[in-house]
């Protein structure tokens, strides 16, 4: 049961959301206590893991049709939908308790809102339109808001708005490339794909990468990332643009995956 629950919760993917929440903590001008950083990491990771589990319950019919997902515990019958729902619910409740216990009411409320959007808007929309990822990216941009509010930050502060906006921009090419990689799987499951001309090498994709790259440069420009971390951080968006125009999709996908970690590292180095 433990092994199946671990596969259901997808801890590595959930941890990326937790790391993004840490970015929000590290933005705090007066610095964040280690207890708040740990709480943000743990709470958001648990919420993301629980959300992933409930998403798999809702999409178990699709997962059975796709090569990359048919070995998940629900399609294989290793877990029942009821058991998976219970595991996901426990993870979500644990995450909310952690966030409420350290940050008051706002962090868990934001987390609940993100989960409701992800499961109530994105998951059903995924079956209807390829543009569903534009909606799904909203919930993926929320973790830094949780980390920021747990330190007492205001949601209208331009720094957290910029970081959350960058995470939104980052997710689109990331999942775009993922869709291109598994296009046959999506067709097999009957999920809508982007139009044939809209590929990783298309002008609209390059424009999006360019917008994301330009946005990342705003962090050093506004002093959000500075010191010794700034030069290396500025080199990252330039690398993305070069990879996008060279059509090195594998390298571009791998580089995009590093962005949340790179941002957290850069914010940590200037503390």
UniProtKB/Swiss-Prot annotation:
Biological process, per Gene Ontology: heme O biosynthetic process
GO molecular function: protoheme IX farnesyltransferase activity
Entry's Gene Ontology cellular component terms: plasma membrane
PROSITE patterns named among the record's database cross-references: UBIA
Pfam family, one: UbiA
Entry annotated with the keyword Repressor: no
Keywords: Cell inner membrane, Cell membrane, Heme biosynthesis, Membrane, Transferase, Transmembrane, Transmembrane helix
Catalytic activity: heme b + (2E,6E)-farnesyl diphosphate + H2O = Fe(II)-heme o + diphosphate
Function: Converts heme B (protoheme IX) to heme O by substitution of the vinyl group on carbon 2 of heme B porphyrin ring with a hydroxyethyl farnesyl side group.
Family named by the database record: Belongs to the UbiA prenyltransferase family. Protoheme IX farnesyltransferase subfamily.
Remarks, miscellaneous: Carbon 2 of the heme B porphyrin ring is defined according to the Fischer nomenclature.
Protein name stated in the entry: Protoheme IX farnesyltransferase
Species in which this protein is naturally found: Geobacter metallireducens (strain ATCC 53774 / DSM 7210 / GS-15)
């Amino acid at each position: 049961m433990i092994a199946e629950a671990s596969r259901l919760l997808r801890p590595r993917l959930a941890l990326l959301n937790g790391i993004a929440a840490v970015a929000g903590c590290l933005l705090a001008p007066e610095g964040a206590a280690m207890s708040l950083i740990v709480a943000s990491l743990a709470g958001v990771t648990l919420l993301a893991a629980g959300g992933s589990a409930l998403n798999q319950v809702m999409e178990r019919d699709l997962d059975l049709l796709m090569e990359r997902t048919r070995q998940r515990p629900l399609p294989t019958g290793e877990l029942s939908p009821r058991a998976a729902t219970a595991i996901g619910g426990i993870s979500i409740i644990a995450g909310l308790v952690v966030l409420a216990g350290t940050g008051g009411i706002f962090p868990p409320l934001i987390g609940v809102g993100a989960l409701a959007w992800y499961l109530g808007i994105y998951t059903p929309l995924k079956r209807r339109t390829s543009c569903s990822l534009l909606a799904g990216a909203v919930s993926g941009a929320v973790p830094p808001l949780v980390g920021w509010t747990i330190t007492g930050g205001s949601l209208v502060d331009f720094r957290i708005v910029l970081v959350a906006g960058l995470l939104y921009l980052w997710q689109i090419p990331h999942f775009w490339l993922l869709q291109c990689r598994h296009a046959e799987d999506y067709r097999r499951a009957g999920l809508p794909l982007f139009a044939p001309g809209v590929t990783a090498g298309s002008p609209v994709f390059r424009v999006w990468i360019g917008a994301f790259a330009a946005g990342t440069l705003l962090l050093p420009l506004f002093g959000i990332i500075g010191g010794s971390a700034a030069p290396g951080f500025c080199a990252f968006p330039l690398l993305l643009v070069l990879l996008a125009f060279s059509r090195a999709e594998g390298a571009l996908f791998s580089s995009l995956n590093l962005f949340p970690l790179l941002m957290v590292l850069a914010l940590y180095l200037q503390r």
